[in-house]
Amino acid sequence: MNLFSTSIISNYWERFPVSLRLIIKARLWTAIGAGGVLYLSPIIFNSLGFTAEQIGSGITIAAFAGITSRFGTGYLLDKKFSYAKAIKAACLVAIVSDFILFYSQNYITYLCGQFFLGTAAGIYWPSAELAVPLNCNNEIKSSEGYSLARSADAIGVTLGVLLGTIGTYFEFARIIYLIDILCMLYIFHILLNNLGISKNEAKIETKDNIEFDIKNS
């Protein structure tokens, strides 16, 4: 028997709740977009003549923005703010960052782009991490949900860096920002149109399981 057959993979994937599958898809596409931006941006701005100090200061600003926005996002999530809305907000901020960095030719715009990039990450990560256990059910442990989510993150980053490397080979390294914009728009689209549907389907699945248990008891 082929352990990697399509049917086995499909059956494994369908074990997870509909809403969790949606979150996993969002994390995969986020990682694809972010992979190239995070790892290849220093190369782009180094080729423009930026010093190591200038590039490092941009990364520092991104980290500082990420820390402060994480605190703010965590506070709002503790106050029952919707993680889906937070992820959509992160997508919009990331798009702003991508536009700035795509057209950036000087140090000031580079710093602005890095600031928005860090802010987007700070909004996204607490929300994306919280979404995993909230969308697990009695049959799926949060540890299994996290393992799938982190696998999607790793695969996405790998694909993102690969696409960016191909773009660099063809002397169009800034394609990483266009890829990230497309990924963010797609994530925004699927969350906007499918999250409500997936929640309803999840409720139906839960209701069916309860009725099945009652009949068997």
Residue ranges and their predicted role:
Residues S5-A63:
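Helix-loop boundary and gating motifs at the non-cytosolic
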Residues I175-L192:
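Symmetry-related core transmembrane helices of the 12-TM Major Facilitator Superfamily/SLC fold
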Residues K85-F99, I181:
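Structural signature of the two symmetry-related core transmembrane helices
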Residues S57-Y75:
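Central cavity-lining transmembrane alpha-helices of secondary-active solute carriers
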Residues M1-L20, G196-S217:
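Juxtamembrane intracellular "pre-TM" segments in multi-pass secondary transporters
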Residues F115-D153:
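Cytoplasmic helix-loop-helix junction between adjacent transmembrane helices
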Residues I108-F116:
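Paired small-residue
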Residues S69-S82, T168:
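Helix-to-loop junctions at the C-terminal end of transmembrane segments
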